[in-house]
Amino acid sequence: MTTTNRTSHPIALRDATVTDPFWALRQELVRTQVIPYQWNALNDNVPGAAPSYCMHNFKAAAAQNAEHHKEGKAFVPPKYTFRGFEALPDDPAHPDSDKFYGFVFQDTDFSKWIEAVGYSLTHHPDADLEATADTAIDIVCAAQLDNGYLDTYYILNGMDRHFTNLKDHHELYCFGHLTEGAIAYYQATGKRKLLDAACRFADYIDSRFGTADGKLHGYPGHEIAEMALVKLAETTGEQRYADLAEHFVRQRGQQPLYFELEDRRRAREDGRNYAPREQNYAYYQADKPITEQTEALGHAVRAAYFYAGAADVARLTGDSDLLASCERLWRNIVDRKLYITGGIGATHMGEAFSFDYDLPNDTAYSESCAAIALAFFARRMLEIQPKSEYADVMESALYNTTLAGMALDGKSFFYVNPLEVVPEACHRDERKAHVKPVRQKWFGCACCPPNIARIVEDVQQYAYTIGDDSSTLYVHLYMGGGVHARLSGTDVRLDVMSDMPWSGKGSVAVGFDAGDSASDASKDAVFTIALRLPAWAGGETASDAVTVRGRDDISRVIRDGYLYLTGAWHDGDVVDFDFPMPVHMVAANPLVREDAGKVAFVRGPLAYCAEGVDNGANLHLLHADTARIASDPSCVSVDRIVFHAGAVAQDEQGLGEVDAVDMPMTTLTIPAWREVEDSAQTSALYHDWRPAERKTTTATLIPYFAWANRGENEMTVFLRG
């Protein structure tokens, strides 16, 4: 494979550990609570949670496959019957054992779960968990058809119509997640059963898709296969998988539009009139080739997955036009469509991007999966071009929206991540019905919970990459742990200490692995440690916060927001960093109408918010004292506390329940004032204007990821100034 554009590549997961209290705690939570909980959810064993039907479907498909093998030519396969985008049983307590239930993409619940399992087993071998996973894999593989096809929706509903609705029915999306899960499990355990199944499915897809006559000229409706195929190519060494990924990226949006041809054919076969005005192929990023796209449009998760896959292909092929397209779409997202919490996708209509600068707070969609997809895109752009802005955005998406998607006890989840919540509006205003004031135990469309689990268990792969020159280690995120890398022919160990995200203080200790010739104190090794200079610390002006103990001979070069420290490193050398972490009072671009006259507070990678439990009801009457804060930033108090989470259930199904959790955290206390609710004013709907009477107070702000862990109450990120 050519790697013209490639500058660095991810470090192997087993070569990086996380030990700091922040991320290690979350990985342990996923390992001990979330993974077992989600396995129960996949098997419909969580009381009060929406059924998944995921493993039910695999078992049904496996049973049908066994029947086929037993009966041979006498077997009569099901003939396709459309049962809707989501099929539910008449009696949820007694689903038919041979029917498919759930959404068309329900298989991916397993795939993301097994991916998280693989990541967890990499650093925490667990015989019981591995046995459970092996049993699940046996069931899944038993559902695979002899030709390699593996999607239970069509296996159970009728293979005569498979690959006829790529736009909506997610077969290639299911393949992509299956493949990523299979790779993670193989890399953790060395077991190939699921990986071989993924390869057989990939081989079948490769035999059916392409530009040659007789092949399907289509591409995924919901993207992720592109990333998965590149990863599969790099895992197996099979170039044709990377070629198929490139085909999907380049073919998308070419004339004639494949989805339009597909829609017309299906309408004709179903005896319907084709209605072109009802179609919006931009929603699928398929109205034009990516090299002609200038704006991030459509379903936010699909879009960011597509851009990440395109970046992978640009990296492999060295295609400068494709890379320029990725850069152009990145700029549109971060300059005009990105929430301060690292979320994307402003509207619930299609879970999609809205128009430029349309970033409502109380109706924000900001899906958890979309923030994760943005992190995927950012990491791949970092591999091509180590620019700190990619890591800045990636960090924000991970620390804010991604973590907000999961309760602090790991037992409930947000699909949607608003920046302002009034519970009554959520309950009574249908326009805000998608916004939930408390997390849910599970979802019928449960893409987000296992997505959060897999990225948390894999987060260290976002922290580091290794330069393709084999002599540079990039540090993109600051989390405590250990990193092993071969640099300039020497096996190097870096031990990272970090107090993130509460302070910018930490260190990187250099060591040489035992048995390497450089482990002798008289030896050294020449390589580069490239440290990101975070935007929240001042960017490149923060380079003075980095020192190398007793080593004036280490060269220092700043480029694209990274400080490159190069020299002959000795065993025991230590790099210290103490990045400033001021509180930033942030205003949105004036074109963001919803934030006019408002401010938000950011410290380090964290966005902060106000909750009613700390600040009282009617948060719209609470103002930040912007004049005082601007004139004296020291008036904002930064406090290290123990945050007490916990909430009782709101109903017999356990909605809103959060187990008692005590967690170290930082809060902000800012000068503020409240509008006094004058009875003469509030008794009338309208009245003559007069200046609001002010009551001086303070406002307590908590990290955004921690909101809704103390029961149902108001929340806002932006405060009136």
What are these regions, as identified by a protein language model?
Residues 1-109, 134-153:
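Low-complexity, Ser/Thr/Pro/Gly-enriched N-terminal "stalk/linker" regions
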Residues 15, 21, 245, 326, ...:
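C-terminal beta-rich recognition modules with glycine/proline-rich loops and embedded aromatic residues
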Residues 20, 27, 39, 55, ...:
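Hydrophobic core segments within long, regular secondary-structure runs in both alpha-
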Residues 23, 114-127, 176-191, 225-238, ...:
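Well-ordered alpha-helical scaffold segments within catalytic/enzyme domains
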Residues 52, 56-102, 151-170, 220-232, ...:
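Carbohydrate-binding/catalytic loop surfaces
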Residues 157-235:
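A conserved hydrophobic secondary-structure block that centers on an alpha-helix together
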Residues 315-336, 359-411, 422:
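Catalytic-core region of carbohydrate-active enzymes that cleave or remodel glycosidic bonds
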Residues 539-566, 585-591:
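Solvent-exposed beta-strand/loop surfaces of large extracellular or lumenal domains
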